[in-house]
Amino acid sequence: MSTFFTNLRRVNKVYPNQATFLTDNTRLLTTTPAGFTNVLRAPSTRNLGNGRFEPGYNLSNNQFVSAGDINRITRGNDVPRIRNVFQGISDPQIGSLNQLRRADNVPDAGLHVKRTRSDAVKQNFPETNVRSADGVDRALQQNPRLNTYLQGAKTAGVGVLLAGGAYLTFSAATLVQDIIQALNNTGGSYYVRGADGGDTADACLLLSRTCQRDPNMNTSDVVICNHDPLIADTAQLQAICSGFNYQQEQTVCRQSDPAADPDSPQFVDVSDLLPGQTIMCIEPYNLGDLIGDLGLDHLLGEDGLVGKSSNSSDSVSNKLMPLIWLIGAVLFLGLIIYLIYRFVIKGGAGAAGAARAPPVIVLPPPPTQQTYNSTKQQI
């Protein structure tokens, strides 16, 4: 049975002419859910030259969006970008894609959540953007709840599978060494197959598409693909990384990104893969990526800061001392100003007033009044 994501996957390729794309897009429209047809009804192509055309769609602002990008944002449930492309789409219409993804075991949404979470960790907690042993150790000390949790996992000896098919195992002498080993085993091109409605995924490393591996990668701790899902010819596979230059390409993979520019070495035509499968490039992890992958971001931040403040009272006092001195100086200055006003300015004004006052002449009272006043004063 033809499905939306099956037909959308079929147009994620380079076409020899525009007419063929229009035919495939007509089939796609028959399975397109409400809210998405307004864009997919406006097919267009970008001429790449040499009889090659990139399929895509013209938006209302005349902007071209490629079929690869449409695949990426809908498969990955990238809601902000979905709203940006499909103007006026409603929440229920976006939610309708969930069931369609589950029907085809599309794993991209879960992988997108991990990437988004990892990016947020690295942005909000820059101390986790490290790969060295010293950097990892400092980050753990700054986040004691995370440290405590991972130390407990190490004591239990429970290994964890990461998104890229590598494992965080607890077999080294220290937790920091365990983490460094896991980081060394990440990075490369991965063949991913969704299962359980896309909630889980099996991933393996495609060595021929991984053009730069960590020199300390232990392949025995990484799930390696026993075949390439698209290419069977050995010579063709060996040629993928020919002339690779990381400084220019800024990625460790080639032919591993279905949404890349078709003229770049990173583009891969996955139109022949089932919708529940994909090829993707994962750059080497740092600690922030690892935390996001494992969903441990809730162990960062506030509690770690509280722990630091309670265990480092001297540090807190040192930070507050300049403020205390400033407040004291302001109060002292205010006291000086008050004293000057009270005894100099106000006192001087009183003396001047006394000098200017007219003389007072006191007349002696009658004798009877004097006796009365004297008696009254004694009472």
Swiss-Prot record:
It is a multi-pass membrane protein. InterPro entries: Baculo_ODV-E56 (IPR006733). Structural protein that is specific for occlusion-derived virus (ODV) envelopes but not of budded virus (BV). Keywords: Glycoprotein, Late protein, Membrane, Transmembrane, Transmembrane helix, Viral envelope protein, Virion. This is Occlusion-derived virus envelope protein E56. Belongs to the baculoviridae E56 family. The keyword Transferase does not apply. It is found in: Virion membrane. Glycans are attached at residue 184. The chain crosses the membrane at residues 156-176, 320-340. GO terms for cellular component: membrane; viral envelope; virion membrane. Signal peptide: none annotated. It comes from the Viruses. The gene is ODVP6E. Expressed late in infection. Its main location: virion.
